[in-house]
């Protein structure tokens, strides 16, 4: 069976959903837009570059490409601390993934199922 091709857009989707999970919020809760600033201020939630690499299940090159794209789009901030990277989602990142998760689910359904075939589908895909 041929491997299903995944591009950096779907990897960005995986990374953003991982960052939302680190915040511990319900992405679809009512009134989220009004709460985002307070949530981001109250919680020091971040993931490492290694955690992003693990989530997207790809190599160092693709991990860097994904992080750089998310940073360029304003969806994350990246802080280097003692040789390690702390990646945090921004308000724009939360609003983007909330708006486009349904689109990603429709367009990339085969790739998402393939990506999570051994771990089980993530909460945001169900």
Model-derived segments and their meaning:
Residues 1-37:
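Short alpha-helical segments that sit at the start of domains
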Residues 10-23, 66, 94-103:
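Extended low-polarity, hydrophobic cluster-rich segments
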Residues 27-55:
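Short acidic, hydrophobic short linear motifs in intrinsically disordered regions
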Residues 32, 81-103:
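Short, cationic-aromatic polyanion-contact patches
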Residues 55-56, 80:
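Core residues of bacterial helix-turn-helix
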Residues 57-72:
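Short amphipathic alpha-helical interaction segments
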Residues 71-81:
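A short, conserved structural fragment
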Residues 94-121:
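Short, amphipathic alpha-helical interaction segments positioned at domain boundaries
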